[in-house]
Amino acid sequence: MPLLNSVTTPYAEALLQVVNENSQTEEMVSEVKQLLELINNSPELEKALSSPILETDAKKKIINEIFSKKVNSSLLNFLKLLADRQRIGILTSILDRFLEIYRENSNIALATVTSAVELTDEQKGLITKKIINIAGTEKLELVTKIDPSLIGGFVASVGSKVIDASLASQIRKLGLSLSK
């Protein structure tokens, strides 16, 4: 991934600089997340933008038709620039890197919490407070996932730290201690 980061980082930093100059940070972060979700949920779109067969002008036309009413002009121009520079194929990596740099600069930790069932807002709030203390950041961006195999409880990961408070893990530990 370091090689890809060496390509994506300058573009991500340039986008962040434009955003900061125009005081559009929160709006842009929201649009970037929506754009990533749209591309990740549309393999056809990702394939079209990544296609070496499709001409740059055709890609820019697709970008304009799909995104002109969904994103602000700065982001639209950025997408067209990536098409011109033959970098639109790594758009998701560039946008992911943009979000990483934004979080680093804003002291926001990204946490993934996997639970057996959907968490209530109260549970999310309690988990968020605990993770903020562990991560040592001011803010936290929480991504939740559901995995019924956990049986109960949750598994949270922030960076390289993992908190396994799942029932499946406790049962596994109990089984190991009984087998000794």
Swiss-Prot record:
Pfam families registered for this protein in UniProt: OSCP
UniProt KW keywords: ATP synthesis, CF(1), Hydrogen ion transport, Ion transport, Membrane, Thylakoid, Transport
Cellular compartments annotated: Cellular thylakoid membrane
Membrane topology: Peripheral membrane protein
Claim: Transport is one of the keywords in the record: yes
One GO cellular component term: proton-transporting ATP synthase complex
The keyword Thylakoid appears for this protein: yes
Coiled coil regions, renumbered to chain: none
UniProt GO molecular function: proton-transporting ATP synthase activity, rotational mechanism
Superkingdom in the source lineage: Bacteria
Family statement: Belongs to the ATPase delta chain family.
Role, per record: F(1)F(0) ATP synthase produces ATP from ADP in the presence of a proton or sodium gradient. F-type ATPases consist of two structural domains, F(1) containing the extramembraneous catalytic core and F(0) containing the membrane proton channel, linked together by a central stalk and a peripheral stalk. During catalysis, ATP synthesis in the catalytic domain of F(1) is coupled via a rotary mechanism of the central stalk subunits to proton translocation. This protein is part of the stalk that links CF(0) to CF(1). It either transmits conformational changes from CF(0) to CF(1) or is implicated in proton conduction.
PANTHER family in alphabetical order: ATP SYNTHASE DELTA CHAIN (PTHR11910)
Description of how the protein assembles with itself and partners: F-type ATPases have 2 components, F(1) - the catalytic core - and F(0) - the membrane proton channel. F(1) has five subunits: alpha(3), beta(3), gamma(1), delta(1), epsilon(1). CF(0) has four main subunits: a(1), b(1), b'(1) and c(10-14). The alpha and beta chains form an alternating ring which encloses part of the gamma chain. F(1) is attached to F(0) by a central stalk formed by the gamma and epsilon chains, while a peripheral stalk is formed by the delta, b and b' chains.
Protein name (record): ATP synthase subunit delta
Species of the source: Prochlorococcus marinus (strain MIT 9301)
Organism ancestry: Bacteria, Bacillati, Cyanobacteriota, Cyanophyceae, Synechococcales
Name of the gene encoding the protein in the UniProt record: atpH
